[in-house]
């Protein structure tokens, strides 16, 4: 029989949607010649805020 290990929920990944501005947006970022621009059109399902649907793509 293998030994049991205890998993703590507070360690590592914490589920939930974070505010976009706090996690991805960096206003002081300066573009480089090697950067690639990608555009996505997102249509949220009924009842889903547009910002949350956009975060799912990010």
Swiss-Prot record:
Gene Ontology BP term (one): reductive pentose-phosphate cycle
Quaternary structure note: Heterohexadecamer of 8 large chains and 8 small chains.
GO function term, MF aspect, one: ribulose-bisphosphate carboxylase activity
Native source organism of the sequence: Rosa damascena (Damask rose)
Range of residues in the leader sequence: none
EC number: 4.1.1.39
SUPFAM superfamilies attached to this UniProt entry: RuBisCO, large subunit, small (N-terminal) domain (SSF54966)
GO CC annotation, single: chloroplast
Propeptide residues according to the Swiss-Prot or TrEMBL record: 1-2
Modified-residue entries (N6,N6,N6-trimethyllysine), positions: 14
Encoding gene per record: rbcL
Protein localization: Plastid, Chloroplast
Catalytic reactions of this protein: 2 (2R)-3-phosphoglycerate + 2 H(+) = D-ribulose 1,5-bisphosphate + CO2 + H2O; D-ribulose 1,5-bisphosphate + O2 = 2-phosphoglycolate + (2R)-3-phosphoglycerate + 2 H(+)
Annotated keywords: Acetylation, Calvin cycle, Carbon dioxide fixation, Chloroplast, Lyase, Methylation, Monooxygenase, Oxidoreductase, Photorespiration, Photosynthesis, Plastid
Family: Belongs to the RuBisCO large chain family. Type I subfamily.
Name of the featured protein: Ribulose bisphosphate carboxylase large chain
């Amino acid at each position: 029989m293998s030994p049991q290990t205890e998993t703590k929920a507070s360690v590592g990944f914490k589920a939930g949607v974070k505010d976009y501005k706090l996690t991805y947006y960096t206003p002081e970022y300066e573009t480089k010649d090697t950067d690639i621009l990608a555009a996505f059109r997102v249509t949220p399902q009924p009842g889903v805020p547009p910002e949350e649907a956009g975060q799912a793509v990010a």
